[in-house]
Structures are given as C-alpha cells and as structure tokens.
C-alpha cells in the first residue's frame, strides 16, 4: 500500500441481521468466509456467564439465552430512546433497552454475573471487530483500514454513530458509503467491459431489516446517485414476524396455549420460520416441525408459498412505493431504466421479483451478483481505491454520492430555509447571507435542520449555535454569511460569520444527537480491548482444558491397547491408570478452571505417564521408536505404537 504499511484495506457491509466482508486481492474482490465457512456472519452478540460470543456462535445459542443475546443494533444506532421506531422495536426484542444520558438508548445484559449496559455503537463495534478478525485470519496480517456501508437513508447522526463504532473497533474508517452505491460499484465493475454511454441503474435493496431503492447513472466509471428512497424499517425480519404471528395463533388454536410471553419458544419458532421462508423461495411448500415447543406440545404445521405471500402481500406491495418515489424524484420514466439490480437476501423471494418485474413491464432483473455479497463487494472496491491498492481496473471509478435529506436553518416564524437540497451530490458547499430580525439584535441563533417539510418543527434538529457580539444596528442591516459544507462522508459543518466584525462561529453536526463524546469513545475503545483480552483468556482456557482432556483419554486408550498393555509392568500400568482416572475426575469438577490450572495438571499427568511409556519403548519396542518417548507428542496425537512392526494406533478424539 502506498507507503502506509498498514496492510490491505477491507470493505465491510455492516447489516441489520447479517454482515459481510471483502478485500481486493489479486486484481479482484475476495468475499471472505468466517471460521464456520459462511460468507455472511450474523450481526449478533451474546453475553453468557463465562464468555462473550459474536456471530454464528451467538446466534446459535440464542434460544437458550434470549435476554442476553443482542441483535438489530443497527436499528438503534444514532437514534434517540424516544423515537417512535425505537419504542415499537422494544416491544419485539427479548433484550432490555433503557434510556441513558441524553436519551441515548442503552442495551442492558448480564455478563459474567454482572449487569452491563452497552450503547448500540459498542454492539456494532463488536460485530465490526469480528468482521476484521475474519479478514485478518484470511489475509494473515493485521487490518487497520476499512470502508463501512450504511443505508442511503441514514441521517447524519446514524452515519456519525456508525463511524464511531468503527473507531471503537480500532478501525480507521476510510469512508462511510451508501449501500446502494456500493452495490452499483459491484454491478458496474461486473458490467464495465461491455457498456458504452450512460446507464440508468435502479438498485433494489431489500435486506434483513432495511429497504433502500436508489437510482444511479453510471457513465465511464462515474457513479452518480440521482435519487434514493426507502423504508428504514422493512425487511426480511418483518416477513418472519408475520409468519411467527400466524403460527402463534395456530398454536393457540391447537393447544390452547399462548407463547407470546415465552422468549425461548418464540425464538425457536422464529428460527424455524426464517428457515421456512428461505425454503419457500425455491419450493412451493414446506413444513415447520418443532419438538416440544411449549408445555410439552410438539408443533407441526405445513405452510405453502401462496400462504406466505398472502401473509406478506401488503408488505411486498409497500416495496413498490419507494420505487415510484425514486423515479419521480429523479424525474425519470420507468422505461428509461436500463438495469434493475437486486441486492439483499429478501430479493430472492419470487413474489418480490415478480412484482418488481411487473412494475417495469416485464423487464429482466439483473441477478448476476450474489445479493448477499454485492454491498461488501462494492465496499471492498472502494477501500482498494481509497488506499491506492487497486489496479487500473478500479482506479478510474469515481463515486458521487448524494445527501439523502435537505439541509437548512430556521428563519423567523419557524420557517425552514433550505441551503442544500436533498439528492445534491456530495461533497458540496453552499453559502447564503442572512440578517437580523429586530433592531439592535445582539446575536443570532443558528439552528440547523434536516428534512423536507416547510416548518422546522416538522423536521429534525441537527444542532444549533450562537453567533453573538453583533454591533447594534437596525434590523436587516447586519450581514451574516452562513456556510453549509458537507464532506465525502456526508458529515456536515456549518459556520456563520458577521461580515462587519469578522466574528465567526461554527459547528460540526455531532453531539447534539446523543452522539458519543471523545471521552466515551476512548473509554469504549479501552473496554473493547479489555473484552478482547478476556475473550483470548477464555480461548486459552478452553484450549488448555481440551489439551488435557485429549492427553488423558488418548493415554487411557494407549494403555488399554493389548499390544501395549501387556508390555507394561502391572505396577506401572496401575500407576498410569490411577493418575489418568484422577485427572479425568478433576476435569469433571473443574470445567471453569483457569488456563494455568489445566496446564499444571497436564504437567503433573505427563510427569507420571511419559517416563513409563518411554521406558516401555526403550525396553520392549526394539529398534527405531526408542528415544524421546511420548513427551514430544502433539496434544491431539496418541503416543506412537510399538516400534517397527506393530500397527499404528488410530487417533481417538
């Protein structure tokens, strides 16, 4: 990398339900599989009485531990506790959310027997750490730099909070880019060789939790976002919920029992529903089977694709509204759309594809990129460009992103005066001159809002600051220049200057919205380090325990082998057997011991067994296998069998 020596830069798709990571390598993007072999990793973090789990391990144990397994952090990030969406989500989540300082939603869990509170940024940072580790394991080097994606619909505070999550995870976030833009890059590279002239591309991204539609034009490597629309709260989980509710009612009918207050039963049902939904994308019917779902009653129920579609028809239809809005905003007719690109796992649902295709009068949909991986793919390309790693294939791609919402300030009477219209290409800068509203007014309050409504009270206040010390003058005389400046990450700086005195004041739109302060972030970075070392301690402990267990059982099998057993003097054999038995007993009683305890026990056991085994080899084995005895053994291998002729012992795990 151009002189920075920080290893390759990665692209991370930080999703509501699943995340994905990619890297530019050998002139192409590699989507990296995790330790379970999956190319997407659940955005789940679980806390137990002994450890912290992230990804598949967390999702797999969720039925046993629903209250301490956190997911959907992306639905909380950068929001206030009182937001309507946070309040409605709270009803559905098994974990507890409370209001922290400045109305910041905090997630409450029990970890190692203590109550802990986490901000959404911290949970997201844990998922980011996991994604970074997946990349590091694949690349064999440390990774510092990353491009992270967010929905096009994310507002300023949600973007800032996502960037903060990256900082807590110890990443240098090169840039935050919009998911549809990332998908378009993936698609654009895919098609680059063949296309000439301007292409209008509609990205239809229906993921686990959010829904985004974007219209872009791609011309000679320049991507320009023309319009975006969507629903921050529509996705695969909503389709699962419909199915869950349907089966809850059915269970009630059949068994006269209501499982709505039973997190574990609900979780098992939800997992089965998610699986059924995926199956129904490729088959017309499937069956939900759950043994003793609740109160000893088994649950067994068929579901057809038609029934699933009917349950969700209103939601599927709702997916078409943002498509129309996007075309209207871009002032484009649907006949002028060249390509429709599907992104997000939920676009595999045949009905969604059919409705979309019908809307575009039967036009073929582009399915050449894997919908789960497109966003991470594009992010990886962007990371390669920003870190100067990519080859000429990518270096001439240029990304022009847009602001999703109009930005402006409040003028007399609560009117929203817009300086930057939504769908303006960023980075951008806009100045306008304002004045005072009353005679001899000593200062002005600059209040910055985002939104499309005419009155500021209907829009979202981003932040405010005071410009004081204006010399007394009649109203309308002082000249105050206000400048709005948006950088490439979509982060806004607002400044105001009094022309006569040259007095200036400015604000970077950050902390007014429950954003983390620098101290908070530093504290969280330290905590993240602490959790990481705890995780490593735990791993060491488990490895030491397993090594001891393997050694004990292998040794036991070795001396039970007749060919070897008969070569041992009875006293030695008994000595070995007793010490193994003692070690196994000790293990059963000390499953939660510390690593060094297991290591000490191992040394103790080896000091008894190894000399006896070595003596036996020197004495009875004849020839080549003498010498070092079993102490050089790998922890997983059984001691070698008798010297030259005898058969080798199979490893028993």
UniProtKB/Swiss-Prot annotation:
One of its GO terms (molecular function) is ATP-dependent protein folding chaperone. It holds the Pfam family HSP70. Induction: Induced by heat shock and cold. Up-regulated by viral infection. Induced by infection with the bacterial pathogen Pseudomonas syringae. Induced by cytokinin. Keywords: ATP-binding, Chaperone, Cytoplasm, Nucleotide-binding, Nucleus, Stress response, Transcription, Transcription regulation. One of its GO terms (biological process) is response to bacterium. It is found in: Cytoplasm; Cytoplasm, Cytosol; Nucleus. Residues 617-653 are annotated as: Disordered. One of its GO terms (cellular component) is cytosol. Expressed in cotyledons, leaves, stems, vascular bundles, roots, stigmas and anthers. It comes from the Eukaryota. The keyword Transcription regulation applies. Residues 619-630 have a biased composition (Gly residues). Disruption phenotype: No visible phenotype, under normal growth conditions. PROSITE patterns: HSP70_1, HSP70_2, HSP70_3. In cooperation with other chaperones, Hsp70s are key components that facilitate folding of de novo synthesized proteins, assist translocation of precursor proteins into organelles, and are responsible for degradation of damaged protein under stress conditions. Belongs to the heat shock protein 70 (TC 1.A.33) family. DnaK subfamily. This is Heat shock 70 kDa protein 2. It comes from Arabidopsis thaliana. The lineage of its organism: Eukaryota, Viridiplantae, Streptophyta, Embryophyta, Tracheophyta.
């Amino acid at each position: 990398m151009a002189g920075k020596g920080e290893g390759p830069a990665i692209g991370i798709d930080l999703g509501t339900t699943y995340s994905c990571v990619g890297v530019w390598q050998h002139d192409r993007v590699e989507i990296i599989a995790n330790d379970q072999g999956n190319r997407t990793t659940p955005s789940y973090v679980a806390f137990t009485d002994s450890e912290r789990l992230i990804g598949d391990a967390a999702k797999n144990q969720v039925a046993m531990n629903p209250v301490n397994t956190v997911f959907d952090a992306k639905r909380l990030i950068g929001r206030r506790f009182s937001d309507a969406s946070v309040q409605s989500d709270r009803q559905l989540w098994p974990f507890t959310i409370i209001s922290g300082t400045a109305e910041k939603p905090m997630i409450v869990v029990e970890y190692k027997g203590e109550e802990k509170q986490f901000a959404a940024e911290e949970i997201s940072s844990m998922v980011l750490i996991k994604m970074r580790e997946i990349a590091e394991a694949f690349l064999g080097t440390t990774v510092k730099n990353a491009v992270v994606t967010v929905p096009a619909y994310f507002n300023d505070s949600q973007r800032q909070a996502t960037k903060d999550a990256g900082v807590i995870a110890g990443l240098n976030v090169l840039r935050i880019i919009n998911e549809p833009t990332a998908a378009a890059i993936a698609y654009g590279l895919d098609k680059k060789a063949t296309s000439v002239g301007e292409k209008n591309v509609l990205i239809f991204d229906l993921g686990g939790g959010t829904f985004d539609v974007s219209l872009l034009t791609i011309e000679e490597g320049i991507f320009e976002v023309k319009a975006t629309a969507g629903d921050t709260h529509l996705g695969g989980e909503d389709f699962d919920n419909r199915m869950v509710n349907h089966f809850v009612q059915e269970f009630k009918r059949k068994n006269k029992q209501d499982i709505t207050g039973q997190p574990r039963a609900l979780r098992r049902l939800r997992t089965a529903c998610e699986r059924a939904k995926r199956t129904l994308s490729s088959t017309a019917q499937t069956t939900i089977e759950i043994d003793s779902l609740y109160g000893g009653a088994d649950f067994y129920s068929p579901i057809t694709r038609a029934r699933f579609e009917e349950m969700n028809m209103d939601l599927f239809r709702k997916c078409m509204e943002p498509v129309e809005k996007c075309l209207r905003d871009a002032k484009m007719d649907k006949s002028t759309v060249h390509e429709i690109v599907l992104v997000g796992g939920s676009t595999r649902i045949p009905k969604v594809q059919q409705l979309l295709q019908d809307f575009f009068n039967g036009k073929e949909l582009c399915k050449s990129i894997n919908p789960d991986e497109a966003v991470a793919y594009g992010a990886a390309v962007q990371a390669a460009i920003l870190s100067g790693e990519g080859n000429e294939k990518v270096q001439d791609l240029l990304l022009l992103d847009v602001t999703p919402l109009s930005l402006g300030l409040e003028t007399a009477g609560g009117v929203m005066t817009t300086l930057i219209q939504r769908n303006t290409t960023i980075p951008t800068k806009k100045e306008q001159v304002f004045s005072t509203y009353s005679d001899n007014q000593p200062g002005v309050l600059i209040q910055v809002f985002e939104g499309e409504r005419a009155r500021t009270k209907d829009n979202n206040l981003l932040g405010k600051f005071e410009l004081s010390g204006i010399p007394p003058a009649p109203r309308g005389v002082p000249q105050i220049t206000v400048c709005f400046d948006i950088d490439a990450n979509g982060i806004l700086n607002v400044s105001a200057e009094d022309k006569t005195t040259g007095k200036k004041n400015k604000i970077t739109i950050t902390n007014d919205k429950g954003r983390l302060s620098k101290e908070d972030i530093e504290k969280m970075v330290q905590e993240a380090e602490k959790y990481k070392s705890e995780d490593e301690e735990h791993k060491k402990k488990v490895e030491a325990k397993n090594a001891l267990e393997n050694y004990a059982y292998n040794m036991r099998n070795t001396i039970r082998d007749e060919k070897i057993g008969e070569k041992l003097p009875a006293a030695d054999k008994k000595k070995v057997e007793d010490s193994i038995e003692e070690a196994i007993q000790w293990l059963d009683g000390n499953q939660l011991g510390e690593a060094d305890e297991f290591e000490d026990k191992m040394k103790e056991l080896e000091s008894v067994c190894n000399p006896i085994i070595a003596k036996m080899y020197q004495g009875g084995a004849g020839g080549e296998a003498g010498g070092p005895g079993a102490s050089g053994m790998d922890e997983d291998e059984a001691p070698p069998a008798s010297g030259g002729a005898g058969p080798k012992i199979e490893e028993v795990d």
